[in-house]
Amino acid sequence: IPESVFSLPKYAINIHPSKLPRWRGAAPIQRSIMAGDKDTAIWIIKMTKALDQGDIILQHDLAITSSMNASQLHDVAAEIGSDLTLQAIDLIEKGQDKAIPQTEEGVTYASKIQKSESKIDFNKTGSEILNLIRGLADYPGAYMEFKGKRLKIFKAEFTEQEHHQNIGAVILDKNSFVINCRNGVIKPLIIQLEGKQKMSVEDFLKGQN
């Protein structure tokens, strides 16, 4: 956006869902979940030509629960962000806005999500895999290979346990299945086989029998 656009009003503002300068960029919600962050924030900042580097007008801290996926965090952030925006506009109109410069310590960047990131690596820990599933639940969906097709996993559970089977091995029973990972097993709950609708694992397995 050209600097000339920013100079038309008193200044332009931006809603950003992260604790800046952590996760500057296009995908802060997904990146924060994928990284296993326990909390984030909704910030109202001044827009500048530099990426997400504007001064802070308002902020609201927000916990990221272990069950929250990117879509759910987005919805919570949008609701809080709309309220903060109205508050910020009111402060600006009254001349009471006191913007604080961002620190440049701890800068990280939230690059756009690439489809190449979405394949699950079961050599990773259960927590890392669940974070990937939660972070990509909205788009594009974390996936594994199942009988030669992509199987997206949108919700899963992890149980930490020792096992002596191959990493990535799928263990099926009547109503569920688990996949061995580095330090336990991943149990998918909501899935979507390539070319099919999203469904529970129980319904999926009924169709396989």
Give names to the regions the model predicted.
Residues 1-109, 116:
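Donor/substrate-binding cores of folate-linked one-carbon enzymes
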Residues 39, 53-54, 115-117, 148, ...:
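Sequence-level motif detector for i,i+2 pairs with an aromatic at +2
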Residues 123-209:
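An anion-binding loop in the catalytic cleft
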Residues 2-12, 32, 47, 73-78, ...:
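Short, surface-exposed, charge-dense and proline/glycine-enriched linear segments
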Residues 90-145:
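Active-site-lining helix/loop region of Rossmann-like oxidoreductase modules
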Residues 61-64, 107-123, 156-165:
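Short, charged low-complexity intrinsically disordered segments located at boundaries
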Residues 22-26, 122, 197:
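Alpha-helix N-cap/helix-start motif
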